[in-house]
Amino acid sequence: MGRKRKHSETEAPAPVKKSDEPAPDRPKRTLLGWKDKSEGEAEKAKALTSSGFKNKEKVLVTCSRRISFRYRSLMLNIVSLLPHCKKDSKVEAKSSKGATLNELIELKNSNSCLFFECRKHKDLYMWMVKSPNGPSVKFLVKAVHAMEEMKLTGNHLKGSRPLLTFSSNFDKDAHWKLLKEMLTQVFGIPKEHRKSKPYHDHVFVFSIVDEHIWFRNYQISVPHNESDKIAKGGLDKMTLIEVGPRFCLNPIKIFAGSFGGPTLYENPLYVSPNQIRALEKRNKAGKFAKKIKAKTRKKMHELSNPLEPDEFADMWKDDE
């Protein structure tokens, strides 16, 4: 057996001095491995410098009850064109619809609304609203043609971002400038939206004709083979093919608030469909009254101008 070591022979270890400096930070771990701290700081700095205005537009699209199938198909076409919109169930079109829709917009976390209101199964009105502070516009929708009934040859990818074009008439008056800005915010798809595609292959055209806003949707068609590459400025080779839908907007009133408030603009040329139908009824009633008057005049003329008796009328009665 070995000899036991004496306590005097063992030397005590020297005490280690602890540094007051904090431990180095551990690098961030990602799916691709450990991430260096300098890289993370560089990305944060880049995000801070690039962060500016970010478009977070969300549009709520809904309609009133008892809407006709034709107008409903138009609404569904618009929903398919706007990937940043949210479709909701029907809302009762009562006098308190403004408060109901404002609450619904807030619940859906939206800041714009397109509300299609159908009356008498004939007339379609569209509210375009910025919530909660306004403004809001009420349109009469005319000349409605949905995609299903036209069957046009144009086709573009669902969810792609459109180019918005406006006629030069939008810059002549203040109310047209306001409508142009609202149409840009509602129909313009935000960049890098999660449901949108990051390229443009169709055009939304808004043009003013006879104080009405006419809407058209065209596909940008570029005929080329796999080997051919079109230059950025080669617009002469691009063609436009209509996709649909088609509709016409007649502005009625512009309000300062959401679904109401002080009137900013009222269209002096607007005639309601009820007045047009009343005039048509009066014209029809006038035609019937003219017929009755013509019959009475004919009878009075016959009574005032009787026919002379014919001397040969009873000539052959004696032979019988």
From Swiss-Prot:
Expressed in roots, rosette leaves, stems, flowers, siliques and seeds. One of its GO terms (biological process) is rRNA processing. Residues 17-40 have a biased composition (Basic and acidic residues). GO terms for molecular function: rRNA binding. Its main location: nucleus. InterPro entries: Brix, BRX1. Pfam families: Brix. Disruption phenotype: Delayed growth rate. This is Ribosome biogenesis protein BRX1 homolog 2. It comes from Arabidopsis thaliana.
